[in-house]
């Protein structure tokens, strides 16, 4: 099948769905300079706050999803998973192999997208599924709102390496992006997809501990959140294993090793591991 390269210097990026995730991605892309906002579009039906949010960035707001598909070279599904099927079948007549479809909808597999936008044709008495098959599945997480997403993508169908590089550049503007086989996405959901909530809980618990030890609430929360941010930066920037970084600050008989001892007695590692495994299991059940 012939490949139709996406024109890097002129392509239009369209979002089906104008929620918070789409907004955070658009802001990151526009702020990074990867793509000017006047080459990004979405559709807002009646929500004036959503319209204002996108127009304030400089994004073109169109009348409906069909207009977005017709206008765009790269179409991003950023809607709730339960409505992806209906939207995909609605826009199916407007698709061509020149368009790249990207889904950020949780739990929606590449094979599902391909099935929903395919056309069933009878050829020599044999039923064949034909039509659009140029897809990339992307899983960002909520820190995309502040440009610190942990994102994973998987190429499907006839998506090319060039398509992957393009999407990597776009989503890399709101954090870091990796490529992985789609079969790993349930585990990825359990780790990076649900992970921010685990860390929010940890920050809250650290702050509560600070309050219990006598700190004012505002100071405790500020120290807890900055400590988590700084520790994460040390892991990513130092290249050291987190275990080594932990050992570096755990002096014999000191305060840190006393705190670590309490965490280990309470099964801290196992609790986090079990949370990831449980969320991954639930993701498999829902998909």
Feature roles, as predicted:
Residues 112, 116-134, 150-187, 200-237, ...:
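Internal alpha-helical scaffold of NAD(P)-dependent oxidoreductase catalytic cores
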Residues 11, 135-136, 185-190, 242-247:
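Short pre-catalytic strand/loop immediately N-terminal to key active-site residues, enriched for Gly-Thr
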């Amino acid at each position: 099948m012939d490949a139709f390269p996406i024109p890097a210097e002129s392509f239009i990026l369209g979002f089906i769905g104008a929620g918070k995730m789409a907004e955070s991605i658009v802001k990151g892309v526009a702020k990074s300079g990867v793509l000017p906002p006047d080459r990004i579009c979405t559709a807002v039906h009646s929500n004036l706050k959503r319209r204002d949010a996108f127009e304030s960035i400089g994004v073109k707001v169109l009348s409906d999803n069909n207009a977005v598909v017709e206008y765009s070279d790269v179409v991003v599904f950023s809607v709730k998973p339960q409505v992806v099927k209906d939207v995909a079948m609605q826009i199916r007549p407007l698709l061509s192999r020149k368009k790249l479809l990207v889904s950020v909808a949780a739990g929606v597999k590449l094979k599902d997208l391909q099935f929903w936008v395919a056309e069933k044709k009878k050829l020599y008495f044999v039923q064949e599924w034909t039509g659009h098959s140029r897809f990339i599945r992307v899983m960002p997480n909520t820190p995309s709102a502040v440009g610190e997403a942990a994102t994973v993508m998987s190429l499907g169908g006839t998506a090319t390496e060039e398509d992957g590089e393009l999407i990597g550049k776009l989503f890399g503007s709101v954090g870091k992006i990796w490529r992985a086989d789609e079969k790993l996405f349930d585990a990825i959901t359990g780790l990076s997809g649900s992970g921010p909530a685990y860390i929010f809980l940890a920050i809250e618990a650290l702050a509560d501990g600070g309050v219990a030890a006598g700190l004012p609430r505002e100071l405790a929360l500020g120290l807890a959140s900055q400590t988590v941010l700084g520790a994460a930066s040390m892991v990513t920037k130092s290249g050291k294993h987190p275990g080594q970084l932990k050992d570096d600050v755990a002096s014999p008989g000191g305060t840190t090793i006393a705190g670590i001892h309490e965490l280990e007695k309470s099964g801290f590692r196992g609790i986090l591991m079990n949370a990831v495994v449980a969320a991954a299991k639930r993701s498999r059940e829902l998909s």
